[in-house]
Design a protein with these regions (language model features):
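Conserved acetyl-CoA-binding loop of GNAT-fold acetyltransferases
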Residues: 141-151
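Hydrophobic pocket/interface hotspot
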Residues: 24-25, 90, 125
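A short, well-structured alpha-helix characteristic of acyl/acetyltransferase catalytic modules
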Residues: 1-51
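Acetyl-CoA-dependent GNAT
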Residues: 43-98
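Short, low-complexity Ser/Thr-rich regulatory SLiMs
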Residues: 15, 80-82, 152
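C-terminal "cap" of GNAT-fold acetyltransferases
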Residues: 88, 123, 130-137, 150-168
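Conserved acetyl-CoA-binding loop-helix of GNAT-fold acetyltransferases
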Residues: 101-115, 138-142
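Long, contiguous binding/interaction regions
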Residues: 120
Length: 168
């Protein structure tokens, strides 16, 4: 999904473009400060690979892939967005380690989810989070996510907790 811009109190969320993928972005995936909880960063990636990943998603109408900007500090992605079931699966990556644990998740998730609700009539947001990522689980619960044993997504890893948030 292209050309989306959402303003929050501290950030501008906007559709990613290939040019947003630079060495700094690559360090979020390959660097020593990468998050241990991001599946995509489990193997080394090249700039070419990451740009292709971004390009495919930005051009897919069932994906909302936004960068978190004041300066680019991370991304939030809804993939896939199922318009028939009025639900989306969310992932969040705070790439800049100095922005982790700064309470940006509620601001970013609420703004982008409400945009999906108001613009696309999405009513449910689902996610999977590593059971060891206690900070993220608490943050999601404060937003309104509930732990769910059965979701619209299949979770086969016993270390992943399924969570769901109703936007109604």
């Amino acid at each position: 999904m292209k050309d989306v811009m959402i303003e929050t109190d501290r950030f501008l969320l906007r559709s990613l473009i290939e040019d947003d993928v630079n060495n700094r972005y690559l360090s979020w995936i390959n660097g020593e400060n990468k998050s241990q909880y991001i599946n995509y960063s489990s193997q080394e990636r090249s700039i070419k690979e990451v740009r292709a990943y971004v390009s495919i998603r930005v051009n897919d109408p069932s994906v909302l892939f936004l960068g978190i900007f004041c300066e680019h500090i991370g991304n939030i992605k809804y993939e896939p967005i199922d318009f028939a079931k009025q639900m989306a699966i969310m992932g969040l990556m705070i790439g800049e380690s100095n922005w982790r644990n700064k309470a940006l998740a509620p601001e970013v998730i609420k703004a982008s989810s409400m945009w999906l609700h108001n613009s696309m009539n999405i009513r449910q947001i689902h996610l999977g989070v590593d059971i060891k990522n206690k900070y993220a689980i608490r943050a999601y619960e404060k937003i309104g996510f509930k732990r769910k044993s059965s979701l619209c997504i299949e979770i086969t890893d016993k270390n992943i907790v399924g969570m769901s948030w109703s936007l109604e």
